[in-house]
Amino acid sequence: MNLSNSIGTSPHVLIMAGGSGSRLWPVSRTNKPKQFYDLLGTGQTMLQHTFDRALALTGSPSRIRVITQTQWGDLVREQLPELAEEHLLLEPIRKQSATATYYGLLSLETETDQDAVVILPCDHFVLDRERFDESIELALRAAVQTKALVIMGVKPTRPEPNYGYVQYVDNPAAGSEEARFHVKTFTDQPSQELANTFIRSGDFAWYTGIKVGGKEAFLDLYRRWMPDLVEVFAEFEAIKDPLLRKSLIDKIYPRCESVSFREGILDKAGTLLLQLGDYGWGDLTYWAEIYREHEKDYFGNAVNGSQVALFDSHNNMIHITGQRIALIDGLENYIVADSPEGILVCPRHKEGELRQRLAVLRRQQTDKNGGDKPPRLT
């Protein structure tokens, strides 16, 4: 679906691929985080799915940029061979999404500063691509017409405490479908009780992290709310040669503030529009989310692995990497996941305690290594 017919020119897309995904231990780790895995057994990684969505919006890989950390550059090259080297933007160190987004915006080769930009996180899934494209098109139209930033929200199907929420009010100036709401508040990962309240109130949506707007609209928000970051990048912006820019970015990044786009921009911005959609969206942050969305066998087992044999086992989340053979007998409501460096066997209802358990494991590993911090548990 090329959107050039509806907004004048195809949008540019920034794919944010710099997160570490540490909650999906032991599969998602520092050396290979979750966006580089096929977590739902579809035959494509999360990054590849996101690139396909971006390509459907732009019509050409030349209008797509992927932003990731330097250490994962080879993974992106391997999984996206159609991405030109100059369109792979590498962060020397992690500085969160506000800096990464600004870096990406300045790297776009736009015809004008009014060109539309779509920012896509790469660790999400979308089940209904047609409805997703339609929702993006509506958001792009609103962004072009109003010169405002439009964020994408999804109608919640349950009180999910692991997601971000956006509260909204009617936007009387909007048409029947195009960005019909103004953004009122953001809340990140509320308590279960508060999530229940949000669902009952009826004026909250899940915040997808997808943002749509003209390039100049994004840059204006940075000039107003993050002027120090703009100043740090002034020399980078003045240089047009891609090779010189890549050498300069190593000097720039240590001076940048580490803050999310929501905290640095969205929480401060006055006028934000919400495009509310329903296209089977989810954020694969926890094993529980992967289990919920994964195809299951007759006994409720979600299995990712080519050589897994299950006997008398029900409602398990099984993720076995590579060609390893696994035989599981008599297990119910468990998570079993492996990687070359670790194995997780955990009741599904105890996944929320995993981070504390890992902290204990790290301390034990440190003690065994004579006080040296173990490198393989992050």
Predicted features along the sequence, with ranges:
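Conserved core of the sugar-phosphate nucleotidyltransferase
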Residues: 129-250, 273, 323, 348
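Short coil/turn connectors at secondary-structure junctions
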Residues: 9-11, 60-62, 84-85, 112-115, ...
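Left-handed beta-helix
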Residues: 2-10, 215-378
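Residue-level signal for inorganic ion chemistry
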Residues: 47, 104, 123, 166, ...
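Short beta-strand segments
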Residues: 15-17, 67, 118-121, 151-155, ...
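Conserved N-terminal catalytic core of the sugar/cofactor nucleotidyltransferase
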Residues: 1-15, 23-33, 41-121, 125-137
